[in-house]
C-alpha cells in the first residue's frame, strides 16, 4: 500500500512538472525573442487586440522602397498597460508610433515591444520584456 501511495504521489508530481513546463517557457523572453536582434521602427497603428495574456499592436511599417510590412508587437498584459497609462483607446487606427523592441527568433515580423513613443513624444514602457531582456532597467 505504501509503494502504491508513493507511486501516486510521484506520478502527480511528474504530471504537474510536465503541464507547467510549456506555460513557463511561454513566458520566457528568450524562448520567443532574440536579445541580439533589437529593432526600432516607425509605423502606423492598424489595430490593437486587448487580450490576455498579452495585448497586441499591429503596425504598418513603410520600407524605403515604398512597400508596407505589417508587424505584430507583443506587449504586456492589458492590466500592466493600464497601470502604465495606456488604454485600448490610446492607440486609435492611424496613430503614428515608434516602437523599440526585439525581433522574434523565427525571423517573422513579430516583436516583443519594449518602449512605444507616441506622436507627442511621450514614451511608454510596454511591459512585455520582463526579466531576461537585455538592459532590464525598467
Residue map of PLM features:
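Short aromatic-glycine-enriched beta-strand elements
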Residues: 51-61
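Bacterial N-terminal signal peptides
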Residues: 9-20
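Short nucleic-acid-contacting surface segments enriched for D/E, G, S/T with interspersed K/R
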Residues: 83-99
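Short N-terminal segments immediately surrounding and downstream of signal-peptide cleavage
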Residues: 26-42
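Conserved hydrophobic positions within beta-strands
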Residues: 43-45, 96
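OB-fold/S1-family single-stranded nucleic acid-binding modules
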Residues: 104-128
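Bacterial N-terminal signal peptides that target proteins for export
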Residues: 1-11
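Sec/Tat signal peptide C-region and signal peptidase I cleavage site
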Residues: 21-25
